[in-house]
Design a protein with these regions (language model features):
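Conserved class I S-adenosyl-L-methionine
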Residues: 1-43
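A conserved beta-strand element that flanks and buttresses the S-adenosyl-L-methionine
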Residues: 103-105
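A short His-aromatic
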Residues: 110-112
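SAM-dependent methyltransferase
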Residues: 136-175
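A short acidic, Gly/Pro-enriched loop at the edge of an enzyme's catalytic core
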Residues: 94-101
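A short glycine-rich, Lys/Arg-flanked "PGG" loop and its adjoining helix->strand segment in the class I
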Residues: 119-131
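Class I SAM-dependent methyltransferase SAM/SAH-binding core
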Residues: 48-92
Length: 175
C-alpha cells in the first residue's frame, strides 16, 4: 500500500490544502481527550498539525509511507508543532501508553484492502485505547444511484489507480 502513497506524496500536499472540513471535528475530540493522541494514516500531517496546534500537545502519527512521513516532518517543523511520527502498518498498531484518542481521518480505513484488514485494525485500536478512550474515523456513505451511473471501470481519475464500482456486489474497489 505504501508504494502508491510514496508515488503520490509530492502531489498530496497540493490536493489536500483545501480539504479541511473534517479538521474541526478531530480538533474538538482532541481537546476533550485527557491523554495521548494518535492519528492513523497521518500522511503529510493534514489533520495532526492543526490538532497539535489547537491542543498544544504532541500527536503520535502512524503511516506506512516514508515519503508522506517525510512531508509531515517538514510541515511540523514549519508550523512549530511536535509530532511523533512513526512508520508502521495501522493493522499492527502498537503504542506503549494507552491512548485517550485514536483517530483516522480522510476515509483512510477504506484503503485497507479487506474486511479482515479493517477488523485487525479495529482490534489493535481497541487494545491500544484507555478504558475510557475514543476511536473516531470517517467513511463515505455508499450511494447506489451514483455508483450505478458509473458502474464498471472508471479510468479518468488524475491518480494512478482505477476505481471499480459494482452495484450488484455492493462494492467499490480502488487499486
Amino acid at each position: 500500500m505504501s508504494s502508491w502513497y510514496d508515488a503520490w506524496a509530492d502531489r498530496y500536499g497540493d490536493w489536500s490544502t483545501g480539504v479541511t472540513a473534517d479538521v474541526p471535528f478531530y480538533v474538538g475530540l482532541a481537546r476533550d481527550a485527557d491523554g495521548p493522541l494518535v492519528e492513523l494514516a497521518v500522511g503529510n500531517g493534514r489533520v495532526a498539525i492543526p490538532v497539535a496546534q489547537a491542543t498544544g500537545r504532541r500527536v503520535i502519527g502512524i503511516d506506512s509511507s516514508p515519503a508522506m512521513l517525510a512531508q509531515a516532518r517538514v510541515r511540523a517543523v514549519e508550523e512549530g508543532v511536535e509530532l511523533d511520527l512513526r512508520e508502521g502498518d495501522i493493522r499492527e498498531l502498537e503504542i506503549k501508553e494507552p491512548a485517550a484518542l485514536i483517530y483516522c481521518p480522510g476515509r483512510s480505513l477504506l484503503h485497507l484492502p479487506t474486511w479482515a484488514d479493517r477488523r485487525r485494525c479495529f482490534e489493535r485500536v481497541a487494545a491500544s485505547l484507555r478504558s475510557n478512550g475514543r476511536f473516531a474515523w470517517n467513511a463515505f456513505a455508499f450511494d447506489h444511484h451514483l455508483a450505478s451511473a458509473i458502474d464498471g471501470q472508471h479510468a479518468d481519475t488524475p491518480l494512478p489507480h482505477t476505481n471499480y464500482y459494482s452495484v450488484g456486489d455492493n462494492r467499490v474497489d480502488s487499486t
